[in-house]
């Protein structure tokens, strides 16, 4: 039994070190169907959900030299490890939580080498994603260019209209 726990601890330590970030969750009223649906939704954003024993997770955090506020860890503990953008994973958790009537509670998280409280993780999840921000910036640059093109197009069509009218009079 001791060897199994050691292997599990090593596996969790490896996941923590390989992940870009993680989100600590408490799950409530979580059926097998919800769990499968949740895991499938996370796979689209390069994240995975693990149900872990608290003691093993906290030992792995300690071994990794990380600090995470784990003061409110009553109930079942689940961790979302994000190998991609941790904000996208947080958004996915928030979306799933809205669809399934608050079956998940944000406890804490770690993103970009910063420890976050549950409320902070939830606030980050409500922000626009990196992809959405890029689209907004491109839109900001593209809007003036499209206006210039529209003005030039209307000037050219006005010139052509004048030439057509002059040609029609002769």
From Swiss-Prot:
Protein name: Large ribosomal subunit protein uL10
Family matches, as NCBIfam families: PRK00099.1-1
One GO molecular-function entry: large ribosomal subunit rRNA binding
Coiled coil: none
Subunit-level organization: Part of the ribosomal stalk of the 50S ribosomal subunit. The N-terminus interacts with L11 and the large rRNA to form the base of the stalk. The C-terminus forms an elongated spine to which L12 dimers bind in a sequential fashion forming a multimeric L10(L12)X complex.
Organism annotation: Chlamydia pneumoniae
Disulfide bonding pattern of the chain: none
Keywords, ordered alphabetically: Ribonucleoprotein, Ribosomal protein, RNA-binding, rRNA-binding
Family, similarity comment: Belongs to the universal ribosomal protein uL10 family.
BP terms from Gene Ontology: translation
Biological classification of the source: Bacteria, Pseudomonadati, Chlamydiota, Chlamydiia, Chlamydiales
Gene expressing this chain: rplJ
InterPro entries in the record: Ribosomal_uL10, Ribosomal_uL10-like_sf, Ribosomal_uL10_bac, Ribosomal_uL10_bac_type
One GO CC term, this protein: ribonucleoprotein complex
SUPFAM superfamilies recorded: Ribosomal protein L10-like (SSF160369)
Function text: Forms part of the ribosomal stalk, playing a central role in the interaction of the ribosome with GTP-bound translation factors.
């Amino acid at each position: 039994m001791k060897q199994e726990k050691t292997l599990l601890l090593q596996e969790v330590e490896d996941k923590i070190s390989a992940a870009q970030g993680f989100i600590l969750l408490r799950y409530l009223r979580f059926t097998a169907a919800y769990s499968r649906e949740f895991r499938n939704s996370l796979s689209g954003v390069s994240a995975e959900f693990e149900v872990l024993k608290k003691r093993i997770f906290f030992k792995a955090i300690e071994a990794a030299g990380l600090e995470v506020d784990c003061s409110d860890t009553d109930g079942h503990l689940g961790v979302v490890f994000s190998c991609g953008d941790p904000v996208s994973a947080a958004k996915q958790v928030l979306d799933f939580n809205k669809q399934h009537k608050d079956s998940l509670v944000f406890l804490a998280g770690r993103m970009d080498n910063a420890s976050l409280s549950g409320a902070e993780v939830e606030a980050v999840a409500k922000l626009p994603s990196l992809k959405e921000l890029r689209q907004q910036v491109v839109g900001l640059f593209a809007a003036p260019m499209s206006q210039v093109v529209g003005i030039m197009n209307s000037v050219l069509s006005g010139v052509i209209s004048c030439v057509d009218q002059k040609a029609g009079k002769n």
